[in-house]
């Protein structure tokens, strides 16, 4: 049996009596006692997540921009100011999603990318292959010397500033999907990004691994609640945010995973997967579902891989959960393209077909329920 990977915060999680699970080969906390309370902390105050299993990768060289114009589906031409971030898919030639990632632009010769844990080695190998084939001459450096802490919630930024006062000046005017580099803090040189995976405001902080436990402890002392993967999943699902490997993978087009907004076909770029996307177009709708109640009760919980029956053919739930914010069973589903918002469909739960309503994503954003 292969030993699990540990983040630099593993001992801190265990000291907090976290319930640990194998998450894609990483020993990670699923909760610290109450997943619901952790979820609520992020929606109403401030919570923090260890996301150090994700991998920071630095790209340097004179042709970094040209490399990303070819490598990713979104358009790095949008990255003009230092610190600007871009969410994109990394595609294979068939138009399938190898990974979803965030690209940060700092200078014309320095871009930084954060990739998912389970796909990191595959991504880096693919980047190296594209770099070599295209003769871009880019230096690609995985940075396992970094850890990442996500501080999320309506009070997250204030509590982060209380913990790292030096970050306030550099980040107080930071707009969403932008990052700043903050040098000389007690926790080393930081990259602080106004990004997240919860539907709430906050920061994702890239910190030297040797300092991350001190930062984690200081944030906790300033009232930021440690949160595990369980709350992270319910929060991201409410927020309408995809999970790689569940809502899309290398056999699924971003156009069929609710990610058409991350694909830029307007610029004349020959990016990997473009020809396949243009040839195939959109084949399915990616929608939200809310399980309908009878006599005030739902007959089950929506879960991944349940079959969705519609008048236009069958679909499948990709992610599902019970929403703490809505007190409803919610899901993402890939369904025939003719399915419309507001339609009623049937979901096969055990031996029953139960009604669910099709809604526009997201369900919740900034603490407000949007899907009724």
Curated annotation (Swiss-Prot):
Which keywords appear in this protein's UniProt record, sorted alphabetically?
Aminotransferase, Transferase
Q: EC top class, in one word?
A: transferase
For this protein, the record's Pfam families field holds:
GCV_T, GCV_T_C
Q: Which reaction does it catalyse?
A: N(6)-[(R)-S(8)-aminomethyldihydrolipoyl]-L-lysyl-[protein] + (6S)-5,6,7,8-tetrahydrofolate = N(6)-[(R)-dihydrolipoyl]-L-lysyl-[protein] + (6R)-5,10-methylene-5,6,7,8-tetrahydrofolate + NH4(+)
What InterPro entries does the record point to? GCS_T (IPR006223), GCS_T_bac (IPR022903), GCST_C (IPR013977), GCV_T_N (IPR006222), GcvT/YgfZ/DmdA (IPR028896), GcvT/YgfZ_C (IPR029043), TrmE/GcvT_dom1 (IPR027266)
May I have one GO cellular component term?
cytosol
EC number(s) reported in the record: 2.1.2.10
Q: Under the GO molecular function aspect, what terms does this record hold?
A: aminomethyltransferase activity; transaminase activity
GO BP terms: glycine decarboxylation via glycine cleavage system
PANTHER family in the record, alphabetically? AMINOMETHYLTRANSFERASE, AMINOMETHYLTRANSFERASE, MITOCHONDRIAL
UniProt function note: The glycine cleavage system catalyzes the degradation of glycine.
**Complex formation:** The glycine cleavage system is composed of four proteins: P, T, L and H.
Family of the protein in this entry: Belongs to the GcvT family.
Name assigned to this protein = Aminomethyltransferase
State which gene encodes it. gcvT
């Amino acid at each position: 049996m292969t030993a699990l990977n540990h983040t630099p915060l593993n001992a801190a999680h265990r000291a907090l009596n976290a319930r640990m699970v194998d998450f894609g080969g990483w020993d990670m906390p699923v909760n610290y006692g109450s997943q619901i309370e952790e979820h609520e902390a992020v929606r109403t105050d401030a919570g923090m997540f260890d996301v150090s299993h994700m991998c920071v990768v630095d790209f340097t060289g004179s042709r970094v921009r040209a490399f990303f114009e070819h490598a990713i589906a979104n358009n790095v031409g949008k990255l003009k100011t230092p610190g600007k971030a871009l969410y994109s898919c990394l595609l294979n030639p068939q138009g399938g999603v190898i990974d979803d990632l965030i690209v940060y632009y700092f200078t014309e010769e320095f871009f930084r990318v954060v990739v998912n844990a389970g796909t990191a080695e595959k991504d880096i190998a693919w980047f190296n292959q594209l770099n070599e084939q295209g003769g871009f001459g880019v230096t690609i450096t995985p940075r396992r010397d970094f850890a990442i802490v996500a501080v999320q919630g309506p009070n997250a930024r204030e509590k982060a500033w209380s913990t790292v006062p030096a970050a306030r000046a550099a980040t107080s005017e930071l707009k969403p999907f932008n990052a700043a580099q903050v040098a000389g803090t007690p926790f080393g040189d930081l990259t602080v990004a106004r990004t997240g995976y919860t539907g709430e405001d906050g920061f994702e902080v890239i910190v030297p691994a040797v300092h991350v436990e001190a930062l984690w402890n200081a944030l906790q002392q300033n009232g930021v609640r440690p949160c595990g993967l369980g709350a992270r999943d319910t929060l991201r699902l409410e927020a309408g945010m995809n999970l790689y490997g569940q809502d899309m993978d290398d056999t699924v087009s971003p156009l069929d995973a609710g990610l058409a907004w991350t694909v830029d076909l307007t610029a004349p770029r020959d990016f990997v997967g473009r020809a396949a996307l243009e040839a195939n177009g959109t084949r399915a709708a990616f929608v939200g579902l809310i399980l309908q109640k009878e006599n005030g009760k739902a007959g089950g919980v929506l879960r991944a891989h349940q079959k969705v029956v519609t008048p236009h053919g069958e679909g499948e739930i990709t992610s599902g959960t019970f929403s703490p914010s809505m007190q409803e069973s919610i899901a993402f589903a890939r369904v025939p393209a003719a399915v419309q918002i507001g339609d009623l469909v049937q979901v096969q739960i055990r031996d029953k077909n139960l009604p669910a309503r099709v809604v526009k994503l997201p369900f919740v954003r900034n603490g407000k329920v949007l899907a009724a």
